[in-house]
């Protein structure tokens, strides 16, 4: 937990202090996570003005990072002082559970699935009914870049927190995601290894993206099945193809969904 706080809280503060120390940064988009919210297991999505919190060290450290961002924004990058005391536009962004090719992190559902499938092993699922807002990594990235471009053009208008989550129908249980991975991969078997003694993990977490939709004109392009299909396609091809070209191809595929 100490390293988690050092990374997520002090790491965030160090970046903001670096921004303060230079005149070359004009826009800062600070990325946290949907887990920054105080999770009450509610059946509707969290809005940007709801309380920060967190049961576990990871979630609470992300909530603390958001509080630090808000503090630095008020104290050092206040919109009212723009052009007088500073020239920085600072916002924070929160996405859902991102998936996509190239993710090999530990204890994440897609990498765990792919590692098991490539090894010819069954996929163990420890929390099958946990519901998450799943989205391909290109979805929030498109939102972050759109926000940054608007902040560049209007530096005092968008200095707030923003949610960039998926469509409502993409908020599904872990088991459904793993099942779809197997379908797209063409083989595999799931094992439910959930036990009552596992570490605490929220069962329900959703984001409300109304603010980004109406104020930025941003909304997700893909549904959950398209997200998983694009992700699995990357993992099936990366060993035999040029990864850079594959990524560019997938960006083009993603952009085509919005036409």
Question: Which residues make up each language-model segment?
Answer:
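C-terminal substrate-binding subdomain of Rossmann-fold SDR/epimerase-dehydratase oxidoreductases
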Residues: 97, 117-259
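Amphipathic alpha-helical segments in well-structured domains
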Residues: 8, 12, 106-111, 144, ...
């Amino acid at each position: 937990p100490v390293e988690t706080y050092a990374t997520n809280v002090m790491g965030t503060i160090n970046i903001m202090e670096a921004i303060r120390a230079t005149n070359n940064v004009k826009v800062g988009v600070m990325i946290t996570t949907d887990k920054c919210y105080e999770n009450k297991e509610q059946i509707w999505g969290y809005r940007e003005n709801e309380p920060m919190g967190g049961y576990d060290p990871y979630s609470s450290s992300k909530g603390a990072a958001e509080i630090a961002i808000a503090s630095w924004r008020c104290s050092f990058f206040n919109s009212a002082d723009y052009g007088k005391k500073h020239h920085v536009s600072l916002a924070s962004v929160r996405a859902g559970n991102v998936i996509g090719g190239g993710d090999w992190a530990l204890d994440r559902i897609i990498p765990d699935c792919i590692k098991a499938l490539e090894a010819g092993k069954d996929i163990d699922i420890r929390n099958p009914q946990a519901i998450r807002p799943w989205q391909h990594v290109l979805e929030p990235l498109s939102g972050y870049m759109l926000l940054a471009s608007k902040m560049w053009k209007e530096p005092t208008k968008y200095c707030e927190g923003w949610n960039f989550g998926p469509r409502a129908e993409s908020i599904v249980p872990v088991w459904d995601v793993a099942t779809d991975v197997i379908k797209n991969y063409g083989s595999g078997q799931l094992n439910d290894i959930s036990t009552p003694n596992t570490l605490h993990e929220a069962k329900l977490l959703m984001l409300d993206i109304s603010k980004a939709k109406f104020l930025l004109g941003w909304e997700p392009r893909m549904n959950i099945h398209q997200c998983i299909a694009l992700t699995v396609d990357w993992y099936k091809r990366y060993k035999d193809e040029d990864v850079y070209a594959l990524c560019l191809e997938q960006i083009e595929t993603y952009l085509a969904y919005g036409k």
